[in-house]
Amino acid sequence: MKKRKSRTEVKAVAQYIHMSAHKARRVVDQIRGRSYEETLMILELMPYRASYPIFKLVYSAAANANHNMGFNEADSFISKAEVNEGVIVKKLNPQARGRSYTIKRSTCHITIVLKDRTKKEPTSILERRYGWVDEYKIKYSR
């Protein structure tokens, strides 16, 4: 069964970020559930290297919300933020006497979901399925 797109949330994904997922999770755990403006202030002041790509991703998610859905950034908050492990890039480092050792470079995928506080999620089945509710069906459905 295909999941319908929500009208109250916007998602932005950054893939193959050259960073450990453990280090990125340390930053993402600090911003989960906070408002958009508060998140930007926190990320600007954090001393971690992971905060810059997450800052860019939150900014991009807000731009998507404003352009595609017409959300106001002041009403947005981060409803879901997750970091998953990506592929491990392996490179060869040449050593003495013809040997070589592998360098493992870990990557991660970061997902940020913004939700608007002012917009409500549709409650009835008709509203979720068709986007509208007929007055007749509301009156005589009981």
UniProtKB/Swiss-Prot annotation:
Pfam families reported in the protein's UniProt record: Ribosomal_L22 (PF00237)
SUPFAM superfamilies named in the record: Ribosomal protein L22
Transmembrane segments: none
BP-aspect Gene Ontology terms: translation
Keywords of this entry: Chloroplast, Plastid, Ribonucleoprotein, Ribosomal protein, RNA-binding, rRNA-binding
Gene Ontology molecular function: rRNA binding; structural constituent of ribosome
Gene3D superfamilies found in the cross-reference section: Ribosomal protein L22/L17
Subcellular location: Plastid, Chloroplast
Primary subcellular site in the record, as a coarse category: plastid
NCBIfam families, sorted: rplV_bact
Protein task: This protein binds specifically to 23S rRNA.
HAMAP family per UniProt: Ribosomal_uL22_B (MF_01331_B)
Family: Belongs to the universal ribosomal protein uL22 family.
Subunit structure: Part of the 50S ribosomal subunit.
Protein name: Large ribosomal subunit protein uL22c
Organism: Ceratophyllum demersum (Rigid hornwort)
